[in-house]
Amino acid sequence: MSNIKKFRIKSFKDKSDVLKLNKVSLKFGRKIVLDNLNLQLNKGQILGLLGANGAGKSTIFNLILGLISPDFGSIIINNETVNKYPIYQRTLQFQIGMCPQIGGFFSDLTVYENLKAIAEITISDESYRAEKINSLISKFELDPIRDIKADFLSGGQKKKVSIALALISDPKILLLDEPFAALDVMTIKTLQEIVVDLQRSNNISIILCDHQARDLLKCVDSAAIIHNGKVVAQDTPANLIQNMEAKKAYFGESFNIS
């Protein structure tokens, strides 16, 4: 029998913040990765994490999921400190979905087989399982590619499938790691619309990270700029664009928001 315990899904309280990183610090050897970092995701918010490669964005995701633990500070989900909770408890009990930058699916299975495989793990009711698969195929317009193996899909199609798979368990919090990386302009626009629609229609709280500000800022309510393991600025996209000179002080002249 499986050693994984059964956990009762937590009902998210009617409060503003669903996730907080409170004074979180982390070192890898002598390298300071996160330095007394504070971050908050509000209910129904789309929060963007901006920063150069190595700034600590993916590390924040790994901390939220429980893949690594902080040296100091607290990770709080739905008003509960979860530092010692393993990944399966966090993702199941607190309904966290994750869409990685690369992969997130079985390459040798078709789109439909991928959806079916994850649904069989996460949904016990057979009729709802079929309903969920069909609704995601419809929502993401996957029907033309449902019988194609994931390995043969385009970059944009793979990203759609990966997001759809993350949504099978009806998450309350969704993490999107570099969702626009290496995609063409039209595909990025489609994915931006998908992200905004997910928040509006499903009331999901979303965090997405990217190093391209102009792509991320078009679909978030608020963005936090991560530099040297700290949040050096957090504001609305409009205010960050106006405060461009302050951002260049951290990222140099190559940092372009517009």
Features from the language model and the residues they span:
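Conserved ABC transporter NBD signature motif
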Residues: 73-82, 92-93
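Conserved ABC ATPase signature
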Residues: 149-153
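Conserved ABC ATPase "signature" region
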Residues: 127-145, 196
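Conserved structural motif at the start of ABC-family nucleotide-binding domains
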Residues: 19-21, 34
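Helix-to-loop junction immediately C-terminal to a conserved catalytic motif
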Residues: 65
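The feature captures the beta-strand-to-loop junction immediately N-terminal to the Walker
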Residues: 50-52
